[in-house]
Amino acid sequence: MTFPRLILMVLFSIECGFLFAQEPLTIISYNVENLFDCQHDTLKDDYSFLPDGMHHWTYYRYQTKLDRIAQVIVNISGWESAALVGLCEVENTRCLLDLCYRLKRFHYKYVHYESDDERGVD
């Protein structure tokens, strides 16, 4: 056996040992389907998710939706927190901040990007 081949085999066996020592990770991708707060964003067409709008979106309904989303994330994660949670259809950072507050024991941080959606869904 040549020396380079021996080095390659040793490195491969060391790498495989590290692979087996890894902990499993939970990654969640979740379409929360229109997570809007109940305050108007002047730059967006979010009128249907206001108390007087088509969906009669109230503070109570917003809080209930946040509670349910948080419960789903906890149920999926089990005893360990998910390593990454990706959410779709979230209106703004306020919604993410409110959700992270409900999940504060997991110490989640968030990254938010504004989309070009007229309604404000990101």
What are these regions (language model features)?
Residues 1-23:
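Bacterial Sec-dependent N-terminal signal peptides
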Residues 20-121:
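N-terminal, active-site-proximal structural segment of metallo-dependent hydrolase catalytic domains
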